[in-house]
Every structure is written in C-alpha cells, then in structure tokens.
C-alpha cells in the first residue's frame, strides 16, 4: 500500500508557501485547487520533481444523497496536469 506523501506548494518565485499531502500528486493538487489556487506547482518532498497543474474550482449543486446540513451549492475542484519539471537544486 502506498504511503501518503507530502507536496510543497511553490509560488512563481520558487518559495514554498504551503504543504499538501496525498498518495498521488493529483490528490494534493485537488486539495490546493479547493483552497483557490489556480497555478499549482507541487514539489514532492525529498525529490527535485515539480508537478505542474492548472486548477479551478466551480460551484455545483449538492448531490441528491447529501446530508441536510450541507448547503445547496458546494465547491468542486478540478485540475489538469501540464507536466513535470526537474529542479537543479531545491
């Protein structure tokens, strides 16, 4: 079974501004997109790989089997992978 991995969110200058965890990079990118980030660059901790995603979140009606306390509209994240980049140094 795959362990959860940590991915550091990087801004345009390369500063690490947050950490998201997930078994796959896409899972961490969905968490970042749900917080409102659109240009998502995730560096896997312990490696020099940067996974690049384009993210968005849209409001959709709640599912039919949702609990009563859930609001009528909920945020749904969506990401598209643009590629992987290797860093020279961290």
From Swiss-Prot:
<protein>
    <recommendedName>
        <fullName>Chromosomal protein MC1c</fullName>
    </recommendedName>
</protein>
<comment type="function">
    <text>Protects DNA against thermal denaturation and modulates transcription.</text>
</comment>
<dbReference type="InterPro" id="IPR036620">
    <property type="entry name" value="MC1_sf"/>
</dbReference>
<dbReference type="InterPro" id="IPR008674">
    <property type="entry name" value="MC1"/>
</dbReference>
<keyword id="KW-0238">DNA-binding</keyword>
<dbReference type="GO" id="GO:0003677">
    <property type="term" value="F:DNA binding"/>
</dbReference>
<dbReference type="Pfam" id="PF05854">
    <property type="entry name" value="MC1"/>
</dbReference>
<dbReference type="GO" id="GO:0042262">
    <property type="term" value="P:DNA protection"/>
</dbReference>
